[in-house]
Amino acid sequence: MNIQKMMQDAQQMQEKLQRHMAEMRIEATAGGGTVYVTVTGNKQLISIRIDPAAKDDMEMLQDMIVAAINDAHRRVDEALAGQMQNMMGDMGLPR
C-alpha cells in the first residue's frame, strides 16, 4: 500500500468518525437520577432534565449538574477512544 493511499484512507476514516461523533448521543445522570443530561459526541450539551424536588437545595443541584455533564463528557471520551481503536484496526495498525 502506498503512503498517499494510506493518507487518503485515514482522512476518509477521520471524516466518518467526525460525522459519527456528531450524531452520537451520550446520556449521564447524577444524584440517583435527579439530574439527567444528554450531550452529542462533540460534547455539545443538548438537554438537561432536573427533578423538580431538587430545587430546594440549589448548591447540591449545581454540583449534580456539573457532575452529570462531566460524566457525559468522560463517556464521550471513552466512546471516541473505542472508535479510534476500531479505526486503527481497520487500517491494519496496532491497537
Q: What does each of the following model-derived ranges do?
A:
Residues Q44-L61:
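A short interface-forming secondary-structure element
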Residues E23-R25, T29-R49:
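N-terminal intrinsically disordered, cationic/polar leader segments
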Residues T34-Y36, K55, H73:
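Short beta-strands and strand-coil junctions in structured, solvent-facing domains, enriched
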Residues M1-N2, M60, M64:
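Residues at the start of alpha-helices and the adjacent loop-to-helix junctions
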Residues A10, K43, I65:
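Residue-level signature of catalytic and energy-coupling elements of molecular machines
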Residues Y36-V39, K43, D71, M91, ...:
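Alpha-helix boundary/capping detector
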Residues M1-E27, R74-R95:
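Long amphipathic alpha-helical segments used for membrane anchoring, targeting, substrate engagement
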Residues M64, A68-V76:
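Stable alpha-helical structural segments in soluble proteins, enriched in small hydrophobic residues
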